[in-house]
From Swiss-Prot:
The modification Phosphoserine is found at S312. The chain crosses the membrane at residues 255-283. It holds the Pfam family I-set. The keyword Plastid does not apply. The lineage of its organism: Eukaryota, Metazoa, Chordata, Craniata, Vertebrata. This is Embigin.
């Protein structure tokens, strides 16, 4: 009788237990981790992120709030790139602070209490600290510490640096060239972009494909847009946009393009008034001169004046006569 070999031997009577043991031995151990399991790679990724953010700079800001603060105390926190942020609120009161609580909010939404919060009480001073990492634009916004039922608060406005342009409208004339300028004080944007506004949206300006525009800047924190051969339709709104690691900031500039007839309009109006006044004076002179040279008109005027004089004299002469008659009758 032939002996069974290979798998046939394993499935023969008496060997089912051995087969199960072999299958269990070849099955991967869950404790060792599955390379396709996201939890298997989460730990190294987190360690890499922590190592990446460990070298970030620290931005620390403080706000002092008292029980007499009727309005929110605000502080601007300007960030160009990812940073560690430490926000601290110090509340001072004259009464006991044992029952005083503090709540942190972002854009008026309560933040979850984690190990990043630290609140201490000492005497009549309550100090609350919130420390976290800002690494994207979604973390920008308003962070507020709210104290007690009266909701006395201090607010930190976290945002990227602001670009600044000319506040007043820039006036230029048809055919000329003009320069629009934007500056970012104490900051270095990664990139500058110019846009022209129309009725519906902002249109990017491509200086490489259109010789009408020249974009340059002598420093990294400023940008200049030169527009050549101006037309009236070139007037309108222009935006300069500064790009940072954490977001963007833009500023609006207004350009007014006038034709050369526009400055002459006030002078033309004055000239029209002068011409009208001279015409009226000439008409008066002509009428007066014509009146002097017309003798018939003068005679008629004299006759009318003579008749008026005679009528008045006749009335005056009749009155004394009536008085004499009355005296004779008596």
């Amino acid at each position: 009788m032939r002996s069974h070999t290979g798998l046939r031997a394993l499935v023969a009577p008496g060997y089912p237990l051995l087969l199960l043991c072999l299958l269990a031995a070849t099955r991967p151990d869950p404790a060792e981790g599955d390379p396709t399991d996201p939890t298997f790679t989460s730990l190294p990724v987190r360690e890499e992120m922590m190592a990446k953010y460990s070298n970030l700079s620290l931005k620390s800001c403080n706000i002092s709030v008292t029980e007499k603060s009727n309005v929110s105390v605000e502080e601007n926190v300007i960030l160009e790139k990812p940073s560690h942020v430490e926000l601290k609120c110090v509340y001072t009161a004259t009464k006991d602070l044992n029952l005083m609580n503090v709540t942190w909010k972002k854009d008026d939404e309560p933040l979850e209490t984690t190990g990043d919060f630290n609140t201490t009480k000492m005497g009549n001073t309550l100090t609350s600290q919130y420390r976290f990492i800002v690494f994207n634009s979604k973390q920008l916004g308003k962070y507020s510490c709210v104290f007690g039922e009266k909701e006395l608060r201090g607010t930190f406005n976290i945002h990227v640096p602001k670009a600044h342009g000319k506040k007043k409208s820039l006036i230029a004339y048809v055919g000329d060239s003009t320069v629009l300028k934007c500056v970012c004080q104490d900051c270095l944007p990664l990139n500058w972009t110019w846009y022209m506004g129309n009725e519906t949206a902002q249109v990017p300006i491509d200086a490489h494909s259109n010789e009408k525009y020249i974009i340059n800047g002598s420093h990294a924190n400023e940008t200049r847009l030169k527009i050549k051969h101006l037309l009236e339709e070139d007037g309108g709104s222009y935006w300069c946009r500064a790009t940072f690691q954490l977001g963007e900031s833009e500023e609006q500039n207004e350009l007014v393009v006038l034709s050369f007839l526009v400055p002459l309009k006030p002078f033309l109006a004055i000239l029209a008034e002068v011409i009208l006044l001279v015409a009226i004076i000439l008409l008066c002179e002509v009428y007066t001169h014509k009146k002097k040279n017309d003798p018939d008109a003068g005679k008629e005027f004299e006759q009318i004046e003579q008749l008026k004089s005679d009528d008045s004299n006749g009335i005056e002469n009749n009155v004394p006569r009536y008085r004499k008659t009355d005296s004779a009758d008596q």
